[in-house]
A protein has these predicted regions:
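Catalytic-loop of the protein kinase fold
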Residues: 133-149
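AlphaC helix of the eukaryotic protein kinase fold
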Residues: 51-70
Length: 219
């Protein structure tokens, strides 16, 4: 569990960051920024002003960072630090330059039509999920928007661990309906396990194959 003493609390944002640039990748409860410190870029996720004093959302942020700190894998975004400034709690992760899977499908429709690219994508994704599962973490929100392909080499990066389910933080698991397993749709959080992610992986494959002009069996 993260205690208050673990937070970085500068007197002002200017003392910590050289540049803060808003991004469009905002969530329902959070805002996103590209920040620069000592010449290096980071992704900053911060609670929206209307939620910054909400104990539940603060705990969810702490949960996300605690999970991120447990994981070290080349295909999962690297969590750097958690802190607090005049706008409230924030999380810093590595800044990934590239595209989400959904953006890749739209901007480069031939990419996944190449079987080597497709195989490489799913091998890396499975390896990343295997790492999470080996730490008793269920990702719970596998979808095209939460998977990036890096600009160089198109390496997989799973981003946003905010909806992960663990034994310690099971109450805050989330989902995206189009990729949610039946137990998620039924709000049966006590039934979530690694198979929940495998179901979403199948839905993701189905989505990509459809965009490739192919169809997988529905059953």
């Amino acid at each position: 569990m993260i205690e208050t003493s673990d937070f970085i609390t500068p007197e002002s944002e200017e003392e910590l960051f050289e540049r803060i640039e808003p991004l469009q990748a905002n969530g329902i409860t959070s805002l996103s920024y590209l920040v620069v410190r000592e010449g290096k870029q980071f992704f900053m996720k911060q609670l929206r002003p209307e939620h910054k004093d909400n104990p539940r959302y603060i705990l969810i942020f702490k949960k996300e960072f605690a999970i991120g700190q447990r994981i070290s894998h080349p295909n999962i975004v690297d969590y750097k630090e958690i802190g607090e400034n005049s706008e409230g709690i924030y999380i810093l992760t590595e800044y990934v330059t590239g595209e989400t899977v959904e953006e890749k499908l739209a901007n480069d429709p031939d990419y996944f039509r190449n079987n080597i690219n497709l195989d490489n994508f799913f091998r890396q994704l499975l390896d990343a999920l295997g790492c999470l599962h080996s730490h008793n973490i269920v990702y719970c929100d596998l979808k095209p928007a939460n998977i990036m392909l890096t600009r160089i080499n198109n390496n997989v990066k799973i981003i946003d661990l905010g909806f992960c389910d663990t034994d310690d933080y099971a109450f805050s698991a989330g989902m995206s309906e189009n990729y949610a397993a039946p137990e998620q749709l039924q709000k049966a959080s006590n039934k979530l396990d690694t198979r929940t992610d495998i179901y979403a992986l199948g839905r993701l494959l189905q989505h990509i194959e459809k965009r490739r002009g192919r169809r997988l069996p529905s059953k």
